[in-house]
């Protein structure tokens, strides 16, 4: 009898936890045909991989950048 309760408890826990990973609404309404498509502004600035100056060194202390 103890094995039945343990098995049912494990199954109930597993079934209840499977819903935890689901995200978003359970019902997806039809898309609005009159709505404009979503746009996102793209920032085209590129960042160099080598820093211009290392601000971590104080005075003649060690620096992480070879000049």
Swiss-Prot record:
Domain of life: Bacteria
GO cellular component, one term: cell outer membrane
Region (Disordered): 26-67
Compartments in which it is found: Cell outer membrane
Signal peptide: 1-19
Organism of provenance: Salmonella typhimurium (strain LT2 / SGSC1412 / ATCC 700720)
Keywords, in A-Z order: Cell outer membrane, Lipoprotein, Membrane, Palmitate, Signal
Family: Belongs to the LptM family.
Function text: Component of the lipopolysaccharide (LPS) transport (Lpt) pathway that promotes efficient assembly of the outer membrane LPS translocon (LptDE) by the BAM complex. Facilitates oxidative maturation of LptD by stabilizing a conformation of the LPS translocon in which LptD can efficiently acquire native disulfide bonds, thereby activating the LPS translocon.
Membrane protein topology class: Lipid-anchor
Gene that this sequence comes from: lptM
N-palmitoyl cysteine lipid sites: 20
Database matches in InterPro entries: LptM_cons
Pfam family, one: LptM_cons
SUBUNIT field: Interacts with the outer membrane embedded portion of the LPS translocon formed by LptD and LptE (LptDE).
Protein's name according to its UniProt entry: LPS-assembly lipoprotein LptM
Chief localization: membrane
Lipidated residues (S-diacylglycerol cysteine): 20
């Amino acid at each position: 009898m103890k094995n039945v309760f343990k098995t049912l408890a494990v199954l109930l826990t597993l079934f209840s936890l499977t819903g935890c990973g689901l995200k978003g609404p359970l019902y997806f309404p039809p898309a609005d045909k009159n709505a404009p498509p979503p746009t996102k502004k793209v920032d085209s600035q590129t960042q160099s991989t080598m820093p211009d100056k290392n601000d971590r060194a104080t005075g003649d202390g060690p620096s992480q950048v070879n000049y």
